[in-house]
């Protein structure tokens, strides 16, 4: 048996004590109790905050959403296959942040701001929290500048202003995304940055939208945030908040941004899934009690803010500029039921809605907007002067036409005035049709609406209205470019009206279509 030397033992112990690294950092740790469907229940973490990031073994993160007496319920961000019962986890003291800034323009990112388009890393200089409090009443400014969508039906009847929230609502396959994509394409050259948030869609659908935006040169001013159907519910729930934070960066620097949430029904479904898995009490349609707050706190962040607010946030770097974030949330209805829980919630939060109908879409009227139900509550004060002046008769003509068309089915003999109204309404309906990816300028809309109001379409066959419009716009852009530029600037006067009348008279007399 080997003899142990007491001095050697004491020397080894002394070395071990000297080499012992003692960390004084206090960490709030817990133990994973269960892992089910992306929801992790944790024992411990006594001082965790609501919404705080929790780090699990293997570099996986989660967010604390349920704070109970004995445990914490957290939702995992991304893949949770490596998380197992008995593993330890710790608080990070941080809330979830995403990258923001100009560097994101032209890129496709996930709900955490990671690039998913294969174009390399995004070198964003700043990050910001995804959950922020909306600007207060004093920080806001009234909506009085337009966002031109480029669709005649929308810009004439339901104008949208910078800082407004305008809901696009309709059944599946009624052209909701088409309206939103046209809005993005039309912002090219206006300085308005666009954020398109795709929630719960097929990856192929998102790729198709991105391809169309690239074809029309609109990706340069657009950020696409995608949480597809294959992504976890947590990502689909967070994506709109991430997109909103990216848009707020531009708003808070005195710039203008437009954000599209496509669509918030899927976000509500994802939130319902998370809430039920967290064992929160279900309410109407099994949604949790705070699903209204989910959408209201998101949509209230879209606003027009005054110059003082911008100056304060930029520490005096940007002076005398107001900023805005305009939101176009999309809601998908089931069989036209706008009285369901989520549609009624979002209708009450937003400043108006564009209602798209299946029957109109199937009848070939696209965009399939129902002019009677669609409304813009604040956009009227933001409408361009020339469009506001000319478009008053359009909504009335369409509303009367639909009423008379329904009535005339039961009447055999109609008087001349009613017949004239029906014919005019039919022509206006035809005139409001517009091909996808072909937005019109203010001047082009003004010419078309003026022609309808002043009776230039009376002797044009309904089937020829589209050809008439194309020929008229081609003629005006080539022969009266100065007049078109003046109207594109938004101005309108008796002199311009006289020039328009003269140009249209000449067109009717000399041109063919």
From Swiss-Prot:
ATP binds at residues 170-177. Keywords: ATP synthesis, ATP-binding, Cell inner membrane, Cell membrane, CF(1), Hydrogen ion transport, Ion transport, Membrane, Nucleotide-binding, Translocase, Transport. It is found in: Cell inner membrane. It catalyses: ATP + H2O + 4 H(+)(in) = ADP + phosphate + 5 H(+)(out). It holds the Pfam family ATP-synt_ab_N. It is an enzyme of class 7 (translocase). GO terms for cellular component: plasma membrane; proton-transporting ATP synthase complex. GO terms for molecular function: ADP binding; ATP binding; proton-transporting ATP synthase activity, rotational mechanism. Its EC number is 7.1.2.2. It is a peripheral membrane protein. NCBIfam families: atpA, PRK13343.1. Produces ATP from ADP in the presence of a proton gradient across the membrane. The alpha chain is a regulatory subunit. HAMAP family: ATP_synth_alpha_bact (MF_01346). This is ATP synthase subunit alpha. It comes from Saccharophagus degradans (strain 2-40 / ATCC 43961 / DSM 17024). The gene is atpA.
């Amino acid at each position: 048996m080997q003899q142990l030397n007491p001095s050697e033992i004491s020397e080894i112990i002394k070395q071990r004590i000297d080499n012992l690294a003692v960390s004084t950092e206090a960490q709030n740790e817990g133990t994973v109790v269960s892992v089910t469907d992306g929801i992790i229940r944790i024992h411990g973490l006594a001082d965790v905050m609501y919404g705080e990031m929790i780090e699990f073994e293997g570099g996986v993160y989660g967010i604390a959403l349920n704070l109970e007496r004995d445990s914490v319920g957290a939702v995992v961000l991304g893949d949770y296959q490596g998380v197992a019962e008995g593993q330890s986890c710790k608080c990070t003291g941080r809330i979830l942040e995403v990258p923001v800034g100009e560097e994101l323009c032209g890129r496709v990112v996930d709900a955490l701001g990671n690039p998913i388009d294969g174009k390399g890393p995004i070198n964003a200089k700043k990050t910001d929290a995804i959950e922020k409090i909306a600007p207060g009443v004093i920080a806001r400014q009234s909506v009085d500048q337009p966002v031109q969508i480029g669709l005649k039906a929308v810009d004439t009847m339901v104008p949208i202003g910078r800082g407004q929230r305008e809901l696009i609502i309709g059944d599946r396959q009624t052209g909701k995304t088409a309206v939103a994509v046209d809005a993005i394409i039309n912002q090219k050259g206006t300085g308005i940055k666009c954020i398109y948030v795709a929630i719960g869609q097929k990856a192929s659908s998102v790729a198709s939208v991105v391809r169309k935006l690239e074809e029309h040169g609109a990706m340069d001013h657009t950020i696409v945030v995608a949480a597809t159907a294959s992504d976890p519910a947590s990502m689909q729930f967070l994506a709109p908040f991430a997109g909103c934070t990216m848009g707020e960066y531009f708003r808070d620097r005195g710039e203008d941004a437009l954000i599209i949430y496509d669509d918030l029904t899927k976000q509500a479904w994802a939130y319902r899934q998370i809430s039920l898995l967290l064992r929160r009490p279900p309410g109407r349609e099994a949604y949790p009690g705070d699903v209204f707050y989910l959408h209201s706190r998101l949509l209230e962040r879209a606003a027009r803010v005054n110059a003082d607010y911008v100056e304060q946030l930029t520490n005096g770097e940007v002076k005398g500029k107001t900023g805005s974030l305009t939101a176009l949330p999309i809601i998908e209805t089931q069989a036209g039921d706008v009285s369901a829980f989520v549609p009624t919630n979002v209708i009450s939060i937003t400043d108006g809605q564009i209602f798209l109908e299946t029957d109109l879409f199937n009848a070939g009227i696209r965009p399939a907007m129902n002019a009677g139900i669609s409304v813009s509550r604040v956009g009227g004060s933001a409408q361009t002067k020339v469009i506001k002046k000319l478009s008053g008769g359009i909504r009335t003509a369409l509303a009367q036409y639909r009423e008379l068309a329904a009535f005339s089915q039961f009447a055999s003999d109609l008087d001349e005035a009613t017949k004239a109204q029906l014919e005019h309404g039919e022509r206006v309906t035809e005139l409001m049709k517009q091909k996808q990816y072909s937005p019109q300028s203010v001047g082009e809309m003004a010419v078309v609406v003026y022609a309808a109001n002043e009776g230039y379409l009376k002797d044009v066959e309904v089937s020829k209205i589209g050809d008439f419009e194309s020929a008229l716009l081609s003629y005006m852009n080539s022969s009266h470019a100065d007049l078109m530029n003046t109207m594109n600037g938004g101005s309108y006067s008796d002199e311009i009206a006289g020039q328009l009348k003269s140009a249209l008279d000449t067109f009717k007399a000399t041109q063919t279509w």
